[in-house]
Amino acid sequence: MSSSLLSVLKEKSRSLKIRNKPVKMTSQERMIVHRCRFVDFTPATITSLAFSHKSNINKLTPSDLRLAIGRSNGNIEIWNPRNNWFQEMVIEGGKDRSIEGLCWSNVNGESLRLFSIGGSTVVTEWDLATGLPLRNYDCNSGVIWSISINDSQDKLSVGCDNGTVVLIDISGGPGVLEHDTILMRQEARVLTLAWKKDDFVIGGCSDGRIRIWSAQKNDENMGRLLHTMKVDKAKKESTLVWSVIYLPRTDQIASGDSTGSIKFWDFQFATLNQSFKAHDADVLCLTTDTDNNYVFSAGVDRKIFQFSQNTNKSQKNNRWVNSSNRLLHGNDIRAICAYQSKGADFLVSGGVEKTLVINSLTSFSNGNYRKMPTVEPYSKNVLVNKEQRLVVSWSESTVKIWTMGTDSSTEQNYKLVCKLTLKDDQNISTCSLSPDGQVLVVGRPSTTKVFHLQPVGNKLKVTKLDNDLLLRTSTKLVKFIDNSKIVICSCEDDVFIVDLESEEDEKPQEVELLEVTSTKSSIKVPYINRINHLEVDQNIAVISRGCGVVDILDLKARISKPLARLNNFITAVHINTSRKSVVVITADNKIYEFNMNLNSEAENEDSESVLTQWSKNNTDNLPKEWKTLKENCVGIFSDIENSSRLWFWGATWISRIDFDVDFPINKRRKQKKRTHEGLTITDESNFMNDEEDDEDDDIDMEISENLNVLLNQGNKIKSTDVQRNEESSGHFFFTDKYKPLLFVDLISSNELAIIERNPLTFHSKQKAFIQPKLVF
């Protein structure tokens, strides 16, 4: 019988129909789809953005270029701009924490350093290898509102609410923050900071003034306030200078304030050159390009304005003009940043809308732009238990569990059976539920807790299980081997087995891991050699690392053996025990299937030698739907009835592939072309070690699908079936109907649970600025 899809339940934003009566159809397969929209996960507001490198249009994009995204729940996300952007790491926040400023330090020969501030007197340096704080430095000068780094990357300046600007020396290397000096104090909060080289600090303050301090070493004016410039006064309230940047080419300062004005100041004489009343509300952020030919501003009115400088050589005084603006956001824009190189041209913005918007910097007015999905589940916060038909979701410090019914006679056939709120400050990093649905493991960066779930009536009774070992163990990833044994990967990358029912549960069985060779990239980006995926099936486990290393673990013998070495970031891993293979997806959405043989020595074998025949035939021959994907694959699972049929899913799509069949090859080939629309890295630098990246030919594939829509009026269920045809034989399916997706998995052989979030529910309680309607 051929495969086809899907019998879709009638969509309701808050309700769920669970069961459809089986319909007998010749040469067709019926599958019930549960569109689960009851999971109330909402991502946090984007509060800050920072690129790890300075722009340089004369060089190729460095392999270690990263974007840090700070959110209002204290999380920091690290993104790689390659392969249409993908998330590499999440640093978990905590209760009542927020990231209000981010700053990178990039010094040759040293690893990247990341600093953050967030509503306290502390500057935090993060350990990028573990995701834990490396150093918390208290500046002892009030709550910090702003942070900036000098050109030499050896000093931080932080602005406080008591009017103090503190300079911190970071030249000692990772983890070393030392007090340098305190600049002359004034009364107003320092809302924003910028440097002119290493010699001057520029601050925007809450009294409507821009101040310039001297930071020159061995100068008699060191620490003194040199100049003060005042912006326009608001009628009813004091003006706030939210953002300032320095423009080296013209020796100017650009400022944005709460009146909606953008002003350009002469640095040398501290005088106003030009002023634009462009925005209808507060200007919250500014950025510029490499050559300072453009300045971009954004804020509460949701618009991004571009200011261009008139470079007419016949004019002595080059003037700034308001050249264009675009309305791309649905709410306040809190942060904006830019990066340029030979192969990169990014203008990135984000805010209350919670999603990232990527523009082309040089063709801003009429170029392409991309709005990322609001949810990108690289780090998943949902799981599905098949045996008990449970859906588990966790966010910040709360775990919620729903049960899904089997009777379609009720309008709302799901129920919240458990809500667990932890008292600890740290956000939950991962959870795992035993196959029988009775034991829940909750992991965080500092501790791990175990709970027993017992059905009592229509609820689940939660009982905490004591385990001193786990209480002092940090957990990054955790999976169940069976109903009592778990495999844990700690934040320090130790992998060990714990038997929860054993009397010796305080003695973990550590698995011996292979050493990973250090590379130029792993020295610069410490987490690149760390474990990012852990998959377990019976007594076999597979781990993958950010650098593309895949190892297979024998949990009985507690040893590991190499499986594959890929030159790309791995976004999803799956063990297929029936086929005795491991399926891996990389950031460029290539599917690799490796033979899984614990008895063979693979140290001297290359990745190609362990590829299955299917992978050799099809890895570079995937359908055009896969080749043009913008969102990465983040999940894989096998079909229950036929393990050769694998399901793949990303934030906005679902696909199924039959691994028993090869894709047809069209001999007609197109010329090489890029499909990234200029919004990702396009030069020849590579993900690892700056090696050249060979682009694959674009192969035409024609996978025909005949979709017949049947409407069952009696049950009010809309179903979609894919008819069998001789060419495709139903071996490939692809849909982008469901979005954005939090999680996808099978509940039974003919039931598919799609955990999606209605985009309308993402809107913040904070009302967006209302733009006047256009009247023609």
Curated annotation (Swiss-Prot):
It comes from the Eukaryota. WD repeats lie at residues 35-40, 132-169, 178-214, 230-266, 271-308, 417-452. Present with 5440 molecules/cell in log phase SD medium. Keywords: Nucleus, Repeat, Ribonucleoprotein, Ribosome biogenesis, rRNA processing, Transcription, WD repeat. It is found in: Nucleus, Nucleolus. GO terms for biological process: maturation of SSU-rRNA; maturation of SSU-rRNA from tricistronic rRNA transcript (SSU-rRNA, 5.8S rRNA, LSU-rRNA); positive regulation of transcription by RNA polymerase I. InterPro entries: UTP4 (IPR046351), WD40/YVTN_repeat-like_dom_sf (IPR015943), WD40_repeat_dom_sf (IPR036322), WD40_rpt (IPR001680). Its main location: nucleus. Pfam families: WD40. Involved in nucleolar processing of pre-18S ribosomal RNA. Required for optimal pre-ribosomal RNA transcription by RNA polymerase I together with a subset of U3 proteins required for transcription (t-UTPs). PANTHER family: U3 SMALL NUCLEOLAR RNA-ASSOCIATED PROTEIN 4 HOMOLOG (PTHR44163:SF1). Interacts with snoRNA U3. Interacts with MPP10. Component of the ribosomal small subunit (SSU) processome composed of at least 40 protein subunits and snoRNA U3. In the absence of snoRNA3, forms a complex with other t-UTPs. This complex can associate with pre-18S ribosomal RNAs. GO terms for cellular component: 90S preribosome; nucleolus; nucleoplasm; small-subunit processome; t-UTP complex. The keyword Repeat applies. This is U3 small nucleolar RNA-associated protein 4. SUPFAM superfamilies: WD40 repeat-like.
